[in-house]
Amino acid sequence: MSSVGTAEPDGDQRDRHVSKLIFFLFVFGAALLCVGVLLSIFGYQACQYKPLSHCSIVLKIAGPSCAVVGLGAVILARSRARLHLRERQRQGLQDPDQSFFCGESRQFAQCLIFGFLFLTSGMLISILGIWVPGCDSDWAQEPLNETNTGEGEPQICGFLSLQIMGPLVVLVGLCFFVVAHVKKKNNLSSSRDTSEVEGGHAHSTEPVHITVGDSVIIFPPPPPPYFPESSAAAPSPGANSLHQIENPPSYSSLFNYGTPTPENQGAASEREQELIYTISGQGSSSERSYTGHLPLDLPPRYEEKETAPATPLGAPSDASPP
């Protein structure tokens, strides 16, 4: 018993460590993905109108590298989470991620963090696209004073893509918030269903409202079960022994042999003074056989009652001579 009791907390602790590792991989991968996307956009816009010699090689490589590493971490965490959930379902255990952080599930926390990261990234991209000036008239007048017009083209131009991409990333973040809300609602409904199943006798007394078009149909609550205690209560060992004692012996044992079954030996020992009358089907005479323990004082036999009145009739016949 002690080995089983110590094995269960070790298994739960291991599952919690795995859940924390999966959560860390999700958050780390999402953060790297957002940073990589931001660096890639900034590097692309900064190096778009500059020659390759003036553009830093680190700025061009850091963004895609961070994005690839973050995407790989998210994919790894996703596959590890599916494998862990499948293993828990095979063992028939409860999912430990249902109450991961402050009573909420791990998926809910992940969606909240993803939504916050994408919302922040989208706002930064939108601010960058709006704050940096584009190709307006003030920027277009600068190259007129220079002799070489080929080198005097505006270098910060084309930030319209950031102004379009920013709201799209913000929209993705809002979608993550909606998914988090749906996850929380599903978890609440599933926990409510499990509590109702575990309760068994819990019965809702509220009417059911069903909307059909513009009309609302109200159905009364379902009736309570007929035998709530018999289905919910578990049989106790004392009750089983009592039922075994009170149950009568089988019909075949009484009819053929007139002896109690082994299950009712205790009942026969308690009822020593009781007689069981059985009818034997083999003989034609209606004799009554006694089984069990007979009392000490037996009643007189039927033959003795027939011979008793015959003796006084025979005595005078012998006494009177011819």
UniProtKB/Swiss-Prot annotation:
Keywords: Membrane, Transmembrane, Transmembrane helix
A Pfam family of this chain: TMEM171
Domain of life: Eukaryota
Gene Ontology CC: one annotated term: membrane
Record keyword Transmembrane helix present: yes
Biased composition (Low complexity): 228-241
InterPro entries from the UniProt entry: TMEM171
Protein name: Transmembrane protein 171
